Amino acid sequence: MARVAVTVPTSAKRGEIIEIKTLAQHVMETGFRRTQTGELIPRDIITEFVCRYNGAEIFRAELRQAVAANPLIAFTTVATESGTLEFTWTGDNGYLANHKAEIKVV
């Protein structure tokens, strides 16, 4: 099972810029390394991260082999209304992780 950590403020003022931080536990194998016997280790990376705020996409990242293991993604958005932030990570070999966080806008 995929392990993720997300930091979102529980409340914010309307119009306030908020910072969101996410961390996904993943080895991010590039597909360029070889075993001791010379065999290529297959690529296994998170390929995409998406964040939706009350159903509307507010952030998307396409990840490549150069991204470190356990990628930390931080970004900002404007708090417009109370609701749900939904986070989705997808990747090679059927990798899928989801997380939801609530925010109250006053």
Task: Annotate each language-model stretch with its function.
Residues 83-91:
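Short, aromatic- and glycine-rich surface loops/edge beta-strands on solvent-exposed regions
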Residues 5-63, 68:
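Contiguous segments within soluble domain cores/interaction surfaces
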Residues 17, 80-84:
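Extracellular Ig-like/FN3 beta-sandwich strand-entry sites
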Residues 91-99:
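Short acidic/polar inter-strand loop motif in beta-rich domains
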Residues 102-106:
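Short beta-strand edge segments in extracellular beta-sheet folds
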Residues 71-75:
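Short strand-edge motifs at loop-to-beta-strand transitions and within beta-strands
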Residues 1-2:
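Proline/serine/threonine-rich low-complexity linkers at boundaries of modular beta-sandwich domains
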